[in-house]
Curated annotation (Swiss-Prot):
Residues 195-247 have a biased composition (Low complexity). Residues 195-258, 376-404 are annotated as: Disordered. Gene3D superfamilies: 1.10.2020.20, Proteasomal ubiquitin receptor Rpn13/ADRM1. Belongs to the ADRM1 family. Pfam families: Rpn13_ADRM1_Pru (PF04683), RPN13_C (PF16550). The gene is adrm1-a. It is found in: Cytoplasm; Nucleus. It comes from Xenopus laevis (African clawed frog). This is Proteasomal ubiquitin receptor ADRM1-A.
Amino acid sequence: MSSGALFPSLVPGSRGSSSKYLVEFRAGKMSLKGSTVTPDKRKGLVYIQQTDDSLIHFCWKDRTSGSVEDDLIIFPDDCEFKRVSQCTTGRVYVLKFKAGSKRLFFWMQEPKTDKDEEYCRKLNEYLNNPPMPGALGGSGSGSHELSALGGEGGLQSLLGNMSHNQLMQLIGPTGLGGLGGLGALTGPGLASLLGSGGPTTSSSSSSSRSQSAAVTPSSTTSSTRTTSAPVAPAAAPATTPSPAVSSNDGASEATSPTQPIQLSDLQNILATMNVPATGEGGQQVDLASVLTPEIMAPILANAEVQERLTPYLPSGESLPQTADEIQNTLTSPQFQQALGMFSAALASGQLGPLMSQFGLPADAVDAANKGDIEAFAKAMQSTSSQKERESSEKKEEEEDMSLD
């Protein structure tokens, strides 16, 4: 399962990838079992690629078959690539994610060792400081796409094409207040457009712009990364609509969960967020360490659970929607990465307004406001149990009526 771009392109012909890799070197994969890593003997290639939507991809492909087995979208300050100093018998490197316990190991296959350190340095540089669109001498399609998004209409169309999970991924990766995730998508341009997409005559838009400009990635990213616990994107059932984020003049706007997320809503959320070091309450939980294959195995063995999860699997000719694919998806690096992103976002205590717009129950919204992951899970479980009881009672009533 490979990770695709976060957004569909709005500009015809702008989708695609750069003709050259930012950095590449020959390296094989390694599998981790317990505390031991075992090398995969296949010839491989590690490379960093910036696609035309400005996203940075960390990839590994089999050089013999040409198959790309790992394709991870990396945001600044997401991870670090470094040599494993404990291994003295080989040139082993690890891609370590800062949110959670996910690690990917590789062993160098370059015949000479003189450039190992340079490859490592360049890889970290491109992961954490992506080049601006067109900075590498390209055709400038990135800036062209940004100009096409100018104004509220273009951005509203962009938001309209996003699912709830994609919006969470947009906001969550590098800290909600830092706009790091936004900046990584299309450089500083998108963050700027979000602050100025509304009409210039609107006083609320002007206020939003000034607040957005005051929040910079450098001011919040590091503190969020080191203190937030990671979590997974979860699509929860909508129940009752709740008030949206308050506007800058103090008035509240009610947003129905069936309506698309408006640009002004996202502007207000991003403009007023100031991520605290930790959530207000509850013990921090790393969902990536909780939802392990060992714990999930007996749950996934349940046929009813399999039936409910199968429709949410990625679809495609090479991706059969089967019970085995459920297991493959949950153990994939992409799922673990998304799990970490959602965990960090939820633990920050800043997802309450977003949960309100999704129509989640009041208990879940309150837990999200506090950054209490455990309370959030219990609230969602309680809602699910209540719906199951209501469904069961309704079914019994229908059966009784049919007997009469």
